[in-house]
Amino acid sequence: MPSPVSLVAEGLLDEQVLRHLLAQSGRDFALGVCYGKRGRDHLAQNIGRFNQAAVHHPFIVLADLENDECPPSLIRQWLPRGCHSNLVLRIAVRKVESWILADGQVFAEFLGIPTARVPLEPDGETDPKARLINLARRSRYRTIREDLVPAPGSTSSIGKNYVGRLTGFVLNHWRAERACRNSPSLERALKAVQTCSPTLGQV
């Protein structure tokens, strides 16, 4: 019988990556609604509530490390009393874009650029989102450049269809098992969801 779980993510792209990661985990989850999607600060302010709610219903949470030192210290900062066993909190180092970049050869083909331009260790990138956008500037495909790269004079940090274009890549091309070879934080996340044992009504 599928294990019912709800999701929590920072944004729409994070949600799609998390859903696809779970779909590829080999586990039979019954995925419910995704909460959050209002940014990292909102997630941080409410993570305690999700941890309390996990007593009655399992949650899988994805957040970005951003500029914090390391995932364990961030988790201790957010949940100083620890995570409930029904709450799986995983941290992308340093942003979810590093997990996308980790499927390097396929992402290079998607952009139409040499594979050698994609970082081999995206978790080591200071700003993987900026790195991804700069790679997209070199794309041979005009539509991809227009979707991912901010338009000249725009005040936005991303292109007009950034989330939509990358969601399409994740759903149609990205494979977690391949990508986790280049991203330790993704590998840890995959193992965590493969081994979690949510229990309804557990206190």
Question: What does each model-identified segment do?
Answer:
Residues M1-P4, E15-V33, A44-I60, L65-V203:
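C-terminal accessory helical subdomains adjacent to catalytic cores in phosphodiester-
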Residues Y35-G39:
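Conserved helicase motor
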